[in-house]
Amino acid sequence: FIERNENVVLIGPSGVGKTHLAMALGYKATQAGIKTRFITAADLLLTLTTAHLQNNLKAVMHRAIKAYRLLIIDEIGYLPMNREQANLFFQVIAALYEKGSLIVTSNLPFGQWDTTFAQDTTLTAALLDRLLHHAHIVPIAGESYRLKHQKQAGMIRSKGDAS
């Protein structure tokens, strides 16, 4: 997918292995000599917001985003963005559109992404249009491995267990 500037979008509830799979794909890309960066959406926004406030956005976009052939952005949708952050995030997606590849993870279905992007349906539609145009969408279902581990250890009860 990287050779064709395509994206991978991993969608599913918390704890089903989206981040693990994204990191494994990034590791394989790195082994193949592809310059790769992994960052959480929160850290990416902190980097971009700081650069914007310091009038250094163009340089940071080049150094932190465009310099990579594969950018992995983890946890889109866990924290809502204000309008400025949503605009900065859109700039990342637009900058890489057909010029690089993205792997993104999210716990939200696409129909709820506007709740993350400052309730801006127009920006969300434009962002999804670019992200999904050349994308492999991988829905992941299942029980959280973290909760499963806790249940196996007897630390929490399954639904329907007697008290």
Residue ranges and their predicted role:
Residues 1-66, 116:
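Conserved P-loop
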Residues 70:
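Walker B motif beta-strand of ABC-family P-loop ATPases
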